[in-house]
Each structure stands twice: as structure tokens, then as C-alpha cells.
């Protein structure tokens, strides 16, 4: 099972961090990427299987480095350059997602017509996030929110406010496949679980898909 806290922690989470000054002044400058945004992702919203997502992933095979979640980490300097890499010929079937790791990004919700996924705030205080209309989709991390029961409650709260729900893994956790079963059980239609080479959850979803047959596919983002 996954540990209570992963490698990615946010501003609304208790955290003990030793040698803070050394990390901030010596280690961080040597390791931190030049990109302003934390992650660039693909969402194969027009797909009926994982094939399209996998093909976009393999289209980036010339990128050099791989992160702990299986994603490519090429040496690029600008956000635009990262976006230009996400091409595999599926212009109408794949949309781009970005983890901006920002605490104040909700102003885009009303004007841009995009899905804004809340992370730390929705975990610690989903009622506040809903009342402030800070986002329109919940990123559901079971090992961050605390329990399966609390996860179900958060999902219901999000859906009652007209939000989407994206079930997510967490950096640094185990290969446990439970969230694959959870996302199918909740019928949210969205899962964030790293690149295809981290295949445990994808394989579990494929097994569930095979068992459910024609009743398996659900696309909440389809217009």
C-alpha cells in the first residue's frame, strides 16, 4: 500500500524538512529545471484506449532523461519548447495538460473555459475550494487525503458542485494498483498515473476493461 505522504508536497501540508538552507541555496540551484511549469501532460480525450497516449509518449523517445514517474525530462529552457514536443498527429483527439504548481491559478477558470484541477487545497479543505470556486476539478490522491472514506466524501462533494474528478497517484509512492480500481468504481473517467512505462495501474485498467467488455468505456470530457 502507498505511504501517507509522497515526494510531492504542497503549501497546505505539514512537512518536516531538515537542512533547509543548504537545500535551498546549494542543492536546489543545481537541480531545479529552467521551466516555470512543473509538468506537461497529454490527455487522450478522444481515445477509446490507451494506444494514443502511448504513441505520443514513444514519439518523445529522443528526449534524454526520465523522471521518477516515467516521464521524459529533456534539457529544455522554455515552456513553449516543451509544448512543441507533444506532437503525434492526433490534433483532435489529444489535449495538453500542465501542472503549473501554482497556488493562485483559479482566475483562468471563469474566462478561459479550461479544466483547472485543484491539488493541495482540495485535499485539505475541499469545502473552501468549492465556496471560493478556486478550480473546477478535484485531483484525488488517496494517500494524501488520508483514507478511502474521506476520498469518497471528497469525490461526492466535488461532483455535487459540478466538478470533474481526476484520481491521481503521488510521487514517491509504491506500484500498488488500487487507484486503477478506484477510478473505475467512481466512474470519473480521469486518472493521472505517470507515463506508460510505469505500467502497473494501466495494466490493471486493461484487465478491468477486458472484464467489463462493452460497458467499460466512459469519457466525461466528450462534448
UniProtKB/Swiss-Prot annotation:
Location of region: Required for interaction with PLG: 202-223
Main localization of the protein described in the UniProt heading: cytoplasm
Coiled coil: none
Modification sites for N6-acetyllysine: 25, 61, 87, 133, 141, 215
GO molecular function, one term: magnesium ion binding
Binding site for Mg(2+) 1: 8
List of residues that carry N6-malonyllysine: 87, 215
A single cellular component GO annotation: phosphopyruvate hydratase complex
Record pathway: Carbohydrate degradation; glycolysis; pyruvate from D-glyceraldehyde 3-phosphate: step 4/5
Function: Glycolytic enzyme the catalyzes the conversion of 2-phosphoglycerate to phosphoenolpyruvate. In addition to glycolysis, involved in various processes such as growth control, hypoxia tolerance and allergic responses. May also function in the intravascular and pericellular fibrinolytic system due to its ability to serve as a receptor and activator of plasminogen on the cell surface of several cell-types such as leukocytes and neurons. Stimulates immunoglobulin production.
Protein name per the record: Alpha-enolase
Catalyses which reaction(s): (2R)-2-phosphoglycerate = phosphoenolpyruvate + H2O
Post-translational modification: ISGylated.
Endoplasmic reticulum in keyword set: no
Organism expressing this protein natively: Mesocricetus auratus
EC number: 4.2.1.11
Active site: 69 (proton donor), 141 (proton acceptor)
Database matches in Pfam families: Enolase_C (PF00113)
Modification sites for Phosphotyrosine: 12
Subunit structure, as described in the record: Mammalian enolase is composed of 3 isozyme subunits, alpha, beta and gamma, which can form homodimers or heterodimers which are cell-type and development-specific. ENO1 interacts with PLG in the neuronal plasma membrane and promotes its activation. The C-terminal lysine is required for this binding. Interacts with ENO4 and PGAM2. Interacts with CMTM6.
Annotated disulfide bonds: none
